[in-house]
Design a protein with these regions (language model features):
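Iron-associated oxidoreductase/ferritin-like identity signal
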Residues: 1-179
């Protein structure tokens, strides 16, 4: 079972699905904002601005899930009860991802976001294929389509940037840890 595969059809209702979707989107917003703050701290304003833009896009996804949730009472799900196999939701960009570096380029930020969005697509695709109820499959397909649109957007953005040159992370005067 992959990290993005729902566990044992644990999402059995629309309400459970929407609670998971809301958690995924909120975690993505928080992670992008955290990454933007880190890039600002390290005087990397271009990448910080990109992460802020990604957070804004994810906030639109939160709004979409909230709209879908109208009329539903969403359950509280403890962090260890989510239907993904990792400590982070499938859509959250990993804070420990390869390429996460204070001197990272926009290319890295977009590639990181693209990987996270593809994991979100995979999560919803699997759920749409495994769910026992048609209403859950329908919402999973809708959420998957939203994530696919984000993947397409990010692929377009990535095409505008060249991979950074070899040695991009070398710093003649690296920051020192503070005690």
């Amino acid at each position: 079972m992959s990290a993005t595969e729902p566990q044992d059809n644990s999402i059995q209702s629309v309400e459970q699905l929407l609670a998971h979707a809301l958690a995924m989107e909120n975690e993505a917003v928080e992670r992008y904002e955290m990454l933007a703050d880190q890039m600002e701290t390290h005087n990397n304003p271009e990448v910080a601005a990109l992460f802020r833009k990604l957070a804004e896009i994810e906030k639109l996804h939160v709004d979409n899930v909230n709209d879908l949730s109208d009329g539903h009472t969403l359950p509280h799900i403890a962090p260890w009860e989510y239907a993904w196999q990792t400590p982070e939701s499938p859509e959250a960009p990993s804070a420990s991802a390869d390429g996460l570096h204070y001197m990272m380029h926009p290319y890295h930020a977009i590639a990181m976001a693209l990987e996270a969005e593809r994991k979100g697509v995979a999560f919803y695709e699997r759920l749409a294929g495994q769910a026992g109820r048609e209403d859950v499959r329908k919402i999973a397909r809708e959420l998957c389509e939203t994530e696919r649109e984000h993947v397409t957007l990010l692929e377009g953005w990535l095409g505008r940037f060249q991979p950074p040159p070899k040695g991009w992370s070398e710093d003649a005067d690296p920051p020192l840890p503070q005690e």
